[in-house]
Amino acid sequence: MENKKINLDKGYVLVYDFGDVKVHNYNTADYIDDQVILLEKNGKIAVIESPAFYDNNKELEKYIESLGVKLDGVLLSYHMGGGTFLKDSKKYATKKADEYGHIGGGKVLVDNFTKAFGESFDNNIHHVTDYINGGTITLADIKMNIIPTGDAFDIEIPEINFIYTHMLGSDCHSIIAGVDYANAMIDILKGYIEKNYNLILTSHYIPEDIKAVDTKIAYIETLLNIASTCNSKDEMIEKVKEEYPNYSGVNYLEMTAGFFFGE
C-alpha cells in the first residue's frame, strides 16, 4: 500500500501519500523493531513516538530536516526513552503516559534495555513540555483524537481513518499482560474492526490493514487457551512457540508468559 520506500543508512521510511496528508513511517531497524510515525500536512510535521538508539535519533532528525517542514511537536505515548531526540522541540503526553515512562513499566523497559544494549541505547527520558487529556489535539493542521489506555494513550487520525496503537503485528508476538489485559485487548481490537480503519500504525511493526486485527484477535484467543492448560511460564512459552513457529518477537512472548505466571 505504501507509495514509496526510502532507504537510509540504517533504517528506512515508508511514505504513504493521501494528497493533503503524508504519513512517513520510519523503521529504525534497531534491536527492538521500533517504528516512528511522521504526519505531514501544509508544510508542517508532527511526530508520534521517539527512536531509542542514538544513531537512529540522528538519522531521523536528518531525514526530518531534509523534508524542509516546520516541526509542530512530538507526541509521546509508550516510548519515553530516547530523550535526546529532537531535544528542544515541544513534547506532548498525558500525565499517565508521562508516569508510565518515568516511573512505571516504560521506565522498567528502559532500564532493562540499557543493561542489554549499553551505550548505543539512549536511556534519557523525554521531558514532557505540554500535558494533554483525552479528547482532541491538532498538530501539523491534523486533528487527532487522544484515546487513553491502561498505560498511556492511542491516537486516532480521522482525516485518513488511521489509528496508532502500541503493538499489533500479524506475525509477531505481543506483550499481553495477563488474562484481564488480553480480554480488554480483544474488545479494543473488535472496535477497530467496527470502525474499519484504513491502516493501523504501531511502534513495533510496519503499518498494517484491518486484516491484521482479525489475525491478532485469533492469536490472543489462542494464547488464552494455551495459558489455561499450562502450569508454568516455560511450558506456556514452549506451547505458544509450537503453535506459532515462525513468529518473531520471542522476547515479547517471554514477557507475556511472565505476566501470566507471576514471574
Label each region the model flagged:
Residues 43-44, 53-97, 196:
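Active-site metal-binding motif and surrounding structural segment of the metallo-beta-lactamase
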Residues 249-263:
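Short, amphipathic C-terminal "tail helix"
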Residues 7-63, 153-167:
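Conserved beta-strand hairpin/beta-sheet module of binuclear metal-dependent hydrolase folds
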Residues 33, 54-56, 76-84, 98-101, ...:
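Active-site environment of divalent metal-dependent phosphoester hydrolases
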Residues 142-196:
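Active-site-proximal loop/helix segments of hydrolase catalytic cores
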Residues 15-17, 82-89, 102-103, 137-138:
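Short loop/helix-cap segments at secondary-structure boundaries that form the rim of catalytic
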Residues 6-10, 97-152:
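Metallo-beta-lactamase
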Residues 182-239, 245-246:
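Divalent-metal (often Zn2+) His-rich catalytic cores of metallo-beta-lactamase-fold enzymes
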